[in-house]
Amino acid sequence: MAGPLLLVAGGSGIVPLMAMIRHRRAARSTVPTRLLYSSRTAEDIIYAEEMDQLVATQPGLGIYHTLTRAQPHGWTGYARRIDVDMLREVATPLGSALRSYVCGPTSLVESVADQLTALGLPADRIRTERFGPTGGTL
């Protein structure tokens, strides 16, 4: 696993990125890795307990949450949709050689990819996986 890595997920888009984080753990990798995960509410955070455990035990791993709907009392994470300022704050410590993987709803993935490009990350260092309605009816 070459790095550093910036992983960005929205909703259930966390599933393939968690597989990458688990692989990182299994390989005993210390590649600097940051995950920025957008959820509607704290109750919608998939793998919340596992993420807490991983951050506590995996050197070089940082996990950052943003909630777009409701934040519980005392919330210390981000409280808005992912934007260029948030990406800059999370990604800058990784340096300019980072690679990014973005997975989630189409609108989130396209927005994040555009913002990463605006921050100067070359398009060939941004990998995306998106999902959403197909638009067809049966």
Residue positions per predicted region:
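Reductase modules of NAD(P)H-dependent flavoproteins
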Residues: R25, V31-L138
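Conserved beta-strand elements of the Class I
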Residues: L5-L6, Y101
